[in-house]
Amino acid sequence: MFEGVLPALITPFTKDDTIDRTGLIKNIEFAENGKVTGVVVCGTTGESATLSTAEHMEVIDIAVECANVPVVAGTGSNNTAEAVELTKHAEEAGASGALVISPYYNKPNKAGLISHFRTIAEAVEIPIVLYNVPSRTGQDISLEVITELAKIDNIVGIKEASGNLDKASQIIENTMDEDFKVTSGDDGLTLPIMSIGGCGVISVVANIVPDRMSRLVNAFNEGDTATAQQLHYEIAPLIRALFTETNPVPIKRAMNLVGLNAGHLRPPLAPISAENNKLLANCLKELGCLQ
């Protein structure tokens, strides 16, 4: 379920600033046509920080209802009780698993982190994937904590987005005795992480080129490293352009440019700069996504 390519879907909004149900369904269909293995909703790319609890649940419900691939629901919070509530809802809605970010801002110690994730895992039966993205949370989940959490039956993997390939390697090394998967949280590190035993990527760029990212991962898994490398370098400029500003600012703009369903950003996020918009458009043209 957590192997292969899972796009971290954006959350499209209507002009009235409500969830664009039709747009979300179309985006899921577009991803599925690109042969992704699953989809992730309500993550960083999905602007979960500015979704109300009701909206969060609504997005999960829509995705589970319409998707033909496994749905992984972002259910993290810096409030343990809220994370439990969201994860329980994901399970009841029929999500295949939950992606749980480390508590942001609070910065709990080792005992607090372990207790937080254990409490969430014990409240449900669906698989849990940890989400480590210190650039957004302000705290890097330590190798010691990850190794301990990997022993919990339904904590089955981690989205590793620290950008530290050596740390990803150590996580894989330390959890070899557990059925624990490491997936890349950085599009540009997908191929390097897979080369050391990672299982795929939870991807931003797959919102717009799901087929290319799926082909990259499949080529590597089939032993065709030359094709995987070719695809890596083919989409690398777009990946860099998607992170010239805070995610999901560039990816939403890119999707709107090529006619996909993204809608606006919720404040305090603001539209992309003219300079970065030009760079993004040029990258899309180079890939044939934009005329």
From Swiss-Prot:
Keywords linked to the UniProt accession: Amino-acid biosynthesis, Cytoplasm, Diaminopimelate biosynthesis, Lyase, Lysine biosynthesis, Schiff base
Keyword Transcription: no
InterPro entries: Aldolase_TIM, DapA, DapA-like, Schiff_base-form_aldolases_AS, Schiff_base-form_aldolases_CS
Leading EC class: lyase
BP GO terms, sorted: diaminopimelate biosynthetic process; lysine biosynthetic process via diaminopimelate
Subcellular location: Cytoplasm
Pathway given in the UniProt record: Amino-acid biosynthesis; L-lysine biosynthesis via DAP pathway; (S)-tetrahydrodipicolinate from L-aspartate: step 3/4
Reaction(s) the record says it catalyses: L-aspartate 4-semialdehyde + pyruvate = (2S,4S)-4-hydroxy-2,3,4,5-tetrahydrodipicolinate + H2O + H(+)
Catalytic residues of the enzyme: 131, 159
Site entry: Part of a proton relay during catalysis: 44, 105
Residues annotated for pyruvate binding in this entry: 45, 202
Single GO cellular component term: cytoplasm
Pfam families the record matches: DHDPS
Coarse class of the protein's main subcellular location: cytoplasm
Domain of life of the native organism: Archaea
PANTHER family: 4-HYDROXY-2-OXOGLUTARATE ALDOLASE, MITOCHONDRIAL, DIHYDRODIPICOLINATE SYNTHASE
HAMAP family documented for this protein: DapA (MF_00418)
Family: Belongs to the DapA family.
Protein name, entry field: 4-hydroxy-tetrahydrodipicolinate synthase
Organism for this UniProt entry: Methanococcoides burtonii (strain DSM 6242 / NBRC 107633 / OCM 468 / ACE-M)
Gene responsible for this protein: dapA
